[in-house]
Amino acid sequence: MATKYPKFSRDLAQDPTTRRIWYAIATGNDFESHDGMTEENLYQKIFATHFGHVAIIFLWASSLLFHVAWQGNFEQWIKDPLHIRPIAHAIWDPHFGKPAIEAFSQGGANYPVNIAYSGVYHWWYTIGMRTNNDLYQGSVFLLLLAALFLFAGWLHLQPKFRPSLTWFKSAEPRLNHHLAGLFGVSSLAWAGHLIHVAIPESRGVHVGWRNFLTTLPHPAGLTPFWTGNWGVYAQNADTTGHIFGTSQGAGTAILTFLGGFHPQTESLWLTDMAHHHLAIAVIFIIAGHMYRTNFGIGHSIKEMLNAKQFFGIRTEGQFNLPHQGLYDTYNNSLHFQLSIHLAALGTALSLVAQHMYSLPPYAFIAKDYTTQAALYTHHQYIAGFLMIGAFAHAGIFWIRDYDPEQNQGNVLDRVLKHKEAIISHLSWVSLFLGFHTLGIYVHNDVVVAFGTPEKQILIEPVFAQFIQAAHGKLLYGMDTLLSNPDSIAYTAWPNHANVWLPNWLDAINSGTNSLFLTIGPGDFLVHHAIALGLHTTTLICVKGALDARGTKLMPDKKDFGFTFPCDGPGRGGTCQTSSWEQSFYLALFWMLNLLGWVTFYWHWKHLGVWQGNVAQFNENSTYLMGWFRDYLWANSAQLINGYNPYGTNNLSVWAWMFLFGHLVWATGFMFLISWRGYWQELIETLVWAHERTPLANLVRWKDKPVALSIVQGWLVGLAHFTVGYILTYAAFLIASTAGKFG
């Protein structure tokens, strides 16, 4: 008899009901719970999947390069990046009639195409690619690399090439290799690429495989390096009149500290970025030699964490949180490690979102408004999902991997012991922010509705304006630090030589970029709305993790695992008690809610900056109807009109996605509100009808149909809610921005 799915669980494979499929999907990635899984095998499997993951990333990047080279307009776009729309790929759609074919033949193409809003054109242009041939070469190279990684993944599953458990548990060597090798050397390699290829290309000098060993990136060669006269590399930078991609106004410097933006491309100076990556490389390569390996020199992390002395001073006291036992707890728990890594990566991605628009690194991307909006939203959403993952795995860690004996008196133990104080403080601050922010919005809404807008409560964000002024923004007239030429920020070493200040001060005060946007009462309010979203999401996440082991309602919770059905025997009222339901399921709704506010704010604020009409945001963002009417409703116009009785336009696909997204989102509520009994009865009715319908009853299935559990229903609801939410806003964002700016 053929083995039924899933092969990883004999118990599930023998389940006679459709539960078999549901539970198999739910536990497919929970390798720990699979039959015959050992700790060593677990580490080996996860290690091998990393190679597959990297291969998929290379394959994806390769496909972008290939399709743009084949069907895009990269070479035409380079000639006029501000006015030509970059093409992602062609569209072949049998449904397209003549109007659709005409509408989607855009970006200079004579056949239907999709416009690219990912910023890859700007990236490839900045790093020195100039021809379709360059793109094809990159594509083939990445394809070969992907194949190599797939082979490496397969190889590391073979008995002879499987690393041992001790190898996986060697924290110090891994840290050294990742710091020096992964971050350090790759940053050095990137600095090398920028200096040897990208900077010469930006000055009209082509560097390819044939001449890159013979073309000096700097006229003085390596002499200044060997003689310690490094300042030579910063002399003769590109002038403010430099035309990117040509020798006009170009200098010879390769490592600079100019600050601000290249006037023509409105992106960071390539020579500044090369300097940055070189500095990062040096720091990380040094950091990768700090930890003790086979040679007996360097730091032992375990010794440092368990130390009671810090440079001869006793460290264990009320405020010096002791870390004894943390090394083994962390090193032996994959969930603990994953939790911290997800939290760190999530934070980094949110920082990427904030910096990509305010300090654009790629040439001309600052003026591709739709791409700017798409990239900001994309990175903030991914950051949100990663942060939820961090807390979900923290919950699993507390249940499966935490040992109270091993962690007595350390940070983990202390956090657990005063979790009530942490959770109640988060609750208090969420309530405070929620009532006060909503109270002011509602008050303002009412007085505007009654025709007395002058009675609004409008609060200037003076502290935030002070911080902006301290960084050099002159508009507020605060005359402090960098906005005051006589202050210590100006006169102190090393800035008395004005290394980077002139360009930075020009940039921060230009008014046409996104650096330190001018803020007022509308920003003050939405800032606190976002703070409410952040604190509420944090409350749910932290409570889900810290209450995972047990609460007053359910003291033995940890014995039930990370997720369990609600209202078990004799446990009425225990729905939404499991760590899964709190740290993952409930937290996701608030995470999405928060991301809505963050992206609405960013987008509406920027529409005003880009259109030269900042008054609309400033005047209408202080009351609720302003957000509904002047941001959401007004910007939905293009979407609602995407296809109409008079034909179609190139926004019609987004208009369709906008409608479809709403449908998917609304479907979620059907699963979120109706519980198990409804689904069981519905399924039984459908089965009854199926078995009595001629022809249809020729098809039978062996599994007895069983309805979703409440928790499974919620998961289906959550999936629809999330996907619909994202589809709806993505379509809205792209169409409303592209509709205005072409």
From Swiss-Prot:
Keywords from the named record: 4Fe-4S, Chlorophyll, Chromophore, Electron transport, Iron, Iron-sulfur, Magnesium, Membrane, Metal-binding, Oxidoreductase, Photosynthesis, Photosystem I, Thylakoid, Transmembrane, Transmembrane helix, Transport
UniProt main location, coarse: membrane
GO CC annotation: photosystem I; plasma membrane-derived thylakoid membrane
Ligand binding (chlorophyll a B1): 662
Cysteine pairs bridged by disulfides in the record: none
Details of cofactor binding: PSI electron transfer chain: 5 chlorophyll a, 1 chlorophyll a', 2 phylloquinones and 3 4Fe-4S clusters. PSI core antenna: 90 chlorophyll a, 22 carotenoids, 3 phospholipids and 1 galactolipid. P700 is a chlorophyll a/chlorophyll a' dimer, A0 is one or more chlorophyll a, A1 is one or both phylloquinones and FX is a shared 4Fe-4S iron-sulfur center.
Membrane topology: Multi-pass membrane protein
Binding site for chlorophyll a B3: 670, 678
Transmembrane segments: 46-69, 135-158, 175-199, 273-291, 334-357, 373-399, 421-443, 524-542, 583-604, 651-673, 715-735
Subcellular location: Cellular thylakoid membrane
Binding site for [4Fe-4S] cluster: 566, 575
EC nos: 1.97.1.12
InterPro entries, A to Z: PSI_PsaA/B, PSI_PsaA/B_CS, PSI_PsaA/B_sf, PSI_PsaB
Keyword Iron-sulfur: yes
Catalyzed chemical reaction(s): reduced [plastocyanin] + hnu + oxidized [2Fe-2S]-[ferredoxin] = oxidized [plastocyanin] + reduced [2Fe-2S]-[ferredoxin]
Subunit structure: The PsaA/B heterodimer binds the P700 chlorophyll special pair and subsequent electron acceptors. PSI consists of a core antenna complex that captures photons, and an electron transfer chain that converts photonic excitation into a charge separation. The cyanobacterial PSI reaction center is composed of one copy each of PsaA,B,C,D,E,F,I,J,K,L,M and X, and forms trimeric complexes.
Similarity annotation: Belongs to the PsaA/PsaB family.
Stated name of the protein: Photosystem I P700 chlorophyll a apoprotein A2 2
Gene expressing this chain: psaB2
